[in-house]
Design a protein with these regions (language model features):
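Helix N-cap/beta-alpha junction loops of NAD(P)-dependent oxidoreductase domains
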Residues: 10-15, 58-60, 108
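Active-site helix of classical SDR
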Residues: 82
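NAD(P)-dependent short-chain dehydrogenase/reductase
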Residues: 88-142, 147-151
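C-terminal substrate-binding subdomain of Rossmann-fold SDR/epimerase-dehydratase oxidoreductases
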Residues: 130, 135-218
């Protein structure tokens, strides 16, 4: 059997000023108790595919590129903290697992919660001839992952007999927020871009996908 554990709250704060205690508790309860329920329910021969997140590194104070899987997590907010806790408990469970640390996932979805992800939000604004705001000038660097590649990789990991009890970064490209906005501008010149001094959680970081590519996934 294969279990793809996708349950979780995605309507989350991206900076401290946007968080609130009630929502944070809900995020943690669904993530931590929910994952424990999954671990307690599956048998030893079952393979668990778990999507974690790049934001477990949101506490990095300086720009860091090509972070590898053995880098110590430094979560701050409820969502990233609960994902880091999930990873720890999955590893300690003695169940068969593959953890995929996703970059910012972009692509078509009927889930409106995912519109808040930067590349999806910028695409929506561009389609409406709107204005993209670049917080802190758009200098933040991010690793992105196309939705189709996430689905392909989950299938690949679930079906692989050789890959067990491993953690992988799942990303395709790394770009600055400003570069994403400029791509949108090229596609739709009618939209506009402005810079602001709004808060960003960090200066950005990127994940290395070398370990993943060594498995044969393309």
């Amino acid at each position: 059997d294969i279990v793809y554990h996708l349950a979780g709250i995605t309507d989350v704060a991206y900076v401290k000023k946007d968080s609130n205690v009630q929502q944070d508790e809900k995020i943690k309860t669904i993530a931590i108790d929910g994952t424990r329920n999954v671990l307690n329910s599956i048998h030893k021969k079952c393979k668990l595919i778990f999507p974690s997140t790049h934001v477990i590194y949101e506490g990095i104070k300086e720009t860091k590129k090509n972070i590898e899987e053995n880098e110590k997590p430094c979560p701050i907010l409820a969502y990233s903290s609960s994902k880091a806790q999930n990873e720890k408990e999955i590893r300690e469970s003695k169940k068969n697992y593959v953890i995929l640390r996703l970059g910012s996932v972009y692509g078509y979805s009927t889930d409106t919660m995912r519109i808040n992800i930067m590349p999806n939000l910028f695409s929506k604004i561009a389609s409406l001839n709107g204005t993209i705001s670049l917080f802190s000038g758009g200098k933040q660097i991010k690793s992105l992952a196309p939705l189709i590649d996430v689905a392909r990789c989950m299938k690949f990991m679930g079906e692989s007999k050789k890959i067990n009890n491993e953690t992988f970064n799942l990303t395709k490209e790394s770009v600055t927020v400003k570069e994403v906005a400029e791509i949108c501008k090229k596609i739709n010149p009618k939209m506009s871009i402005k810079t602001t001094e709004d808060e960003t959680p960090n200066l950005g970081y990127t994940l290395s996908n070398k370990k993943l590519l060594k498995t044969g996934f393309k």
